[in-house]
Amino acid sequence: MTELSPKYNPAEVEAGRYQKWLDADVFKPSGDQKAKPYSIVIPPPNVTGKLHLGHAWDTTLQDIIIRQKRMQGFDTLWLPGMDHAGIATQAKVEERLRGQGITRYDLGREKFLDKVWEWKDEYATTIKEQWGKMGLSVDYSRERFTLDEGLSKAVRKVFVDLYKKGWIYRGEFIINWDPAARTALSDIEVIHKDVEGAFYHMNYMLEDGSRALQVATTRPETMFGDVAVAVNPEDPRYKDLIGKHVILPIVNKLIPIVGDEHADPEFGTGVVKITPAHDPNDFEVGQRHNLPQVNVMNDDGTMNELAGDFAGMDRFEARQATVAKLEELGALVNIEKRVHSVGHSERSGAVVEPRLSTQWFVKMDELAKQAMDNQETDDRVDFYPPRFNDTFLQWMENVHDWVISRQLWWGHQIPAWYNAEGEIYVGEEAPEGDGWTQDEDVLDTWFSSALWPFSTMGWPDTDVEDFKRYFPTSTLVTGYDIIFFWVSRMIFQTLEFTGRQPFQNVLIHGLIRDEEGRKMSKSLGNGIDPMDVIEKYGADSLRWFLSNGSAPGQDVRFSYEKMDASWNFINKIWNISRYILMNNEGLTLEEAESNVAKVAASEAGNVTDQWILHNLNETIAKVTENFDKFEFGVAGHILYNFIWEEFANWYVELTKEVLYSDNEAEKVITRSVLLYTLDKILRLLHPIMPFVTEEIYAQYAQGSIVTAAYPTVTPAFENEAAHKGVESLKDLIRAVRNARAEVNVAPSKPITILVKTADSELEDFFTSNVNYIKRFTNPEKLEISSAIAAPELAMTSIITGAEIYLPLADLLNVEEELARLDKELAKWQKELDMVGKKLGNERFVANAKPEVVQKEKDKQADYQAKYDATQERIAEMQKLVK
């Protein structure tokens, strides 16, 4: 056994440890066919750059789960990997090239892709280094990438199979267009923001000049693509105009007036301009009336030749020029300033342009129905918290067909080929013969990511061992911000191609926010690099903060004050471990376990040993229960309270009564309980703080704590009598300490302590453990009896089953003591009100477990006894007031 260094230094503790784990292969599946499999696939981070604090949180939660399951004897697999992140990564590489004065078009597709692969290799290395610093127990031998050959094969098969079923199709429709990235976007890649804008009201004159029809638009630059105006066929103001024509201003061409229910008589003037190539609703109107589709913009957001004098202008520049021209012509009625919702690209931030474009789509109705129906079966995906199941179902009910083609070079090139005759060939391999050209577009990144849970396991080969053993996966951990982007798509794609759910559970977490509750972003400059935090505090401190502040579905606020508290907690663990190991006298863990069994059987040890083992048992049960519910924050609070309050502040201090004695037999038992409890604490903590627990564990045990058994409840440790007795002992000691502090009596000054109790068992317990009372209260005189008369001038403390009097006549101010007792009385009244309200709730009494209801009734009786005793003491003290 070696000795821990005097001071906890996370840099020293964590240095080299991760590589030792990798060298020992402790992160790989056990291969034990008798063990139940448990698998997680990591949500693949984008190879766009370094990981942020949100990634640290996400992966910490996964590591906690997989480490605990590994210790519980499951055959665990945590499969790592990364996402090619098409549009985001391509944008980063293009930005780097622009700094060198180069565009992707200068390089050409092949050489540009070489540059992107270089970027990928660079940042994949960085990401893996960060994973190592976080201590993530992933199996690198199974690492995947969304563009590796295995996943590419799966992507091609899925595309071809859906195409053959008629669920992938190619067509010309209005889509969301990103003019900055020059690519199509799906609906959920568009972020809507309220912006200051305007409605421009314009007059379109009838062909005969008899009157004008007023229309309004937020995008007057699109008027060059107007092919009609629409009125409601039931609107009496315009019914007689249907079939006639108006003159399109500036362009001076005739366009028809059509009758269509899209025109709302109650909105505006009831007349709308129809621009089928630039508005989804207008596109539908155009389809119904067989109207032409006139696209007036280039793919970069500039106006094309159909805009006449405005050709080549940026769309926003053209907007102002168009308005000025309309005003010059007398066709502009007015400009109405208004805040309205405008779509922006989730990736580039550019204002999205609705644009007519030929794209590939996934038909969603059947896929969505399958996913929703599956949630009614035993094979459903369970969301934590459950409210996100409703979020998932609502999105599925309202989902539109998914545009999956992207006008990029980085990604899975669409497996479709065209020839001069206009034929389309879709297949997993290129068609035979000459004259075929592959579609230049690539698939939406989320198309390949949607296959992640099963493609990483070897699919489409369903006979490989990983697929048979580890699919479906057990748990997915991810943020609520990508339920639509990713979780939903994994569910419907996995169901379609495997007939199974992709994962049994989905743990949804929130976002990391700053101390003020703001979302972390580059624009606010409030982002935190997790590697900087680790450098200062260590990975274990960061992991403890991230888990301890975690509740399913909720956001977390980062603060350095909380990081200080995390470090202090680990430092406390370090110090008590060092104390225990320094006093261990060569005791082995096996010997400690044998001696602890004697304590459990009441063959050795004392009541404090039995008390800590009982509380350890309760802690193990509660922590395990909350881990199973993914309530890591609750589990963390339970661990913190047990370790700091019960173990360090009480039990370790209580053991000094034995360790500083001459009774060698008792010392061995006490050392055994200390080492045994410390060992269980380290195992409970290991999934959360792996580095420091491994460092301490190595001082007294063989092998790695990574594969040590996770603690389980030991029925023999249950000892309610010991628990009740020591809790009363703690209450007594605490009451005396508090009373000393109230009147400024130093702990070193001996005082008289009178303990009155009518409970004979409690009297016997206090009497038999008087050595502990004396050690912690420093009495000049200590009397424990049922026959004690309350002194006139004494401080009074009421604990369960006893009254404690401290005769401090020369120090006590009666009026101040009465004020203190009044506060005590108010406290007990508040507790009585709360428990009374709960017990007065018929639904609670009817639905709660009987033992829970009884616990509340016991509390009520206890609070009532304390209230009555306090009231009685107040009455006695009031007699002393002259």
Swiss-Prot record:
Enzyme class: ligase
GO BP of this protein: valyl-tRNA aminoacylation
Keyword Protein biosynthesis listed: yes
Keyword Transmembrane helix part of the UniProt annotation: no
Its EC number(s): 6.1.1.9
Main localization, broad class: cytoplasm
UniProt feature coiled coil, ranges: 808-882
UniProt xrefs under Pfam families: Anticodon_1 (PF08264), tRNA-synt_1 (PF00133), Val_tRNA-synt_C (PF10458)
Motif ('KMSKS' region): 519-523
Assembly with partners or alone: Monomer.
Designated name of the protein: Valine--tRNA ligase
Lineage of source species: Bacteria, Bacillati, Bacillota, Bacilli, Lactobacillales
